[in-house]
Structure formats: C-alpha cells, structure tokens
Design a protein with these regions (language model features):
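Short membrane-interfacial helix/loop motifs at transmembrane-helix boundaries
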Residues: 13-49, 115, 119-120, 219-224, ...
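Transmembrane alpha-helix signature in integral membrane proteins
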Residues: 49-82
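Transmembrane alpha-helices
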Residues: 7, 11-14, 152, 158-171, ...
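Interhelical loop and adjacent transmembrane-helix boundary motif
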Residues: 42-50, 211, 215-262, 271
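C-terminal transmembrane helix and the adjacent membrane-cytosol boundary/short C-terminal tail
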Residues: 80, 163-178, 246-273
Length: 273
C-alpha cells in the first residue's frame, strides 16, 4: 500500500526537485544549454545586488501580508467558532468566505484594478466626499496594491486552519477560566491563543510559502515597478535562461525551508495533521 504512494511522491515531488537542482549547475549560452557542473549561476546570483533587493522585497511582502492575514483570519475564525452557536450558520458563513475562491486568482486580482485606478471607484468616491482633491496615484501599481491583493487572495488560507483548531478547543476550559474570574482578554491571551498556535502556524506556512512563490500578483499589481523572487525566476524563464532560473529556484526553496524549519521549532503542528 505504501509503495504506490511512495512512487507518486518520488515522481511528482522528489524527481522535479532533483532536476531543478541538476539544471541549476548547467551552463547557458545564447543558443543552447550545456550540461556541465558549474557554479557560475550561483556566483552571479549571490554577487548581484539585485538578488538581495529582490529577496528583501519578497520577505517584505511575506511579512506584511502575514500580519494582515493573521489579524483578519484570527478575527474571522474567532467570530465563527465562539460567537456563532449554530452549526448551520457556521457552515453558511464559512461558505460565504469561500465564494471569492470560486473564481481564479487572476480574476480576483485584476478586479482590484478598476477599483483602485486613478479614475476608479475609490478615487472617485474620495473626491466626491471631499476627502481628497486629486486622485491618489499610489492606490494602484504600488506596493500597497500588491499587498492588498495578497491579503485578498490568501486570507482564507489563514482562516481555515485557525478555525479548525478553534473548533477543537474544549469549551469547558473557557468556562472554567471565566468561573475563575478571568476577563475576556485574559481568556483570549492565556487560553485561546496558546491552544490555537498550531492552526496559526499552519496558516502562516501556507501564506508565507504562497506569497514567496507568487509572481503574477507582483507583476500585475505593481505595474512591473516592483519585483520578487518569483518574478525574477519568471523573467529568466522568459529569456530561456533555465539554469539561472533553476539556481534562483533552489535558493528560494532552501530559504522557504529554513523559514519553515525555524517556525516549526516553536510550535508542534503534528497534532493538527
């Protein structure tokens, strides 16, 4: 029984990674790719200031998106788990949260463009209310637009694991804390949050890995004025520089694995899996 599963994992997970690592050591010319062991791609990658700037942008997007998705996701999950008593209404409201995911990421992302544009709904409304006199140019094709799109796209990935963890919390623990005289804030901080840490960590892994590997959102929502690692890899692929793209992908993969490894040292998520 385990052999077919192992074969699937090797074929669809291990083998592609091995191929990417292998190609990252090859050489590329204007006309061909030469299979050879060479560190030139990594030397160029780590010797370029652009690499460090792009990785900084990637971590910046991941961190800011994580802060907002965690804040929104925890609030929504808390409301569904502890303020909605009816299971039917919990299911209905949870399904409402998933409605945007019935369309593709690109459609949901592009839907912000007419809203945030210079002559879009947001600027027109603010001008009509007298809040501003001139349209705000930074609403679209900026880091603000990129992060807004990320939060919109990936908040549900934070809501689901947190909500799942909260639903497993024994309500008698909360009642016992309340009977002991604990305030709502104390119950939240000392009971709910510690018991929700595995769900928070799973959501964090989802959001951080998705943001760090994304390139379409940065391309469209920044107007090609910003870049992250995913965009860097995409550009290399467009130029048929597959060895360079593979080297960048390997570094990104190792970076994500290190980040996840650090996070897993603080929270044991095995009980949630």
């Amino acid at each position: 029984m385990a052999l077919p599963i192992l074969a699937v994992l090797v074929f669809f997970l291990v083998l592609p990674i091995v191929m990417i690592v292998t190609v990252s050591f090859w050489q590329a010319t204007e006309f061909s790719i030469i299979p050879a062991f060479d560190l030139e791609n990594y030397e160029f990658l780590f010797g370029s200031n652009v690499t460090y700037k792009v990785f900084f942008n990637t971590f910046k997007y991941a961190f800011i998106t994580w802060v907002f998705t965690l804040s929104i996701g925890f609030t929504v999950a808390y409301f569904l788990a502890f303020h909605i008593r009816s299971l039917t209404w919990q299911i209905v409201l949870f399904l409402l949260c998933t409605i945007p995911f019935w369309t593709s990421n690109i459609i949901r992302m592009i839907s912000w463009i007419p809203f945030l544009g210079r002559n879009g709904i947001a600027n027109s409304t603010l001008i009509s209310w007298g809040v501003i006199n001139e349209p705000l140019d930074w609403l679209l094709f900026s880091d603000f637009a990129v992060i807004l799109a990320f939060v919109h796209l990936y908040t549900l990935f934070m809501v689901v694991p947190i909500f799942n963890t909260m639903m497993r919390i024994d309500k008698s623990l909360i009642e016992a804390a309340r009977d002991a005289g604990a305030s709502g804030a104390q119950i939240l901080w000392n009971v709910i949050i510690p018991l929700t840490k595995p769900g928070i960590m799973i959501g964090t892994i989802f959001v951080v890995t998705l943001v760090m590997g994304d390139f379409i959102t940065v391309r469209f929502m920044s107007g090609s004025q910003s870049a992250n690692v995913g965009r860097l890899i995409s550009n290399d692929i467009a130029l048929l520089a597959y060895p360079s793209a593979s080297a960048t992908a390997v570094v990104l993969l190792l970076t994500v694995l290190i980040v996840i490894g650090i996070m897993l040292r603080f929270v044991d998520i095995r009980k949630e899996l």
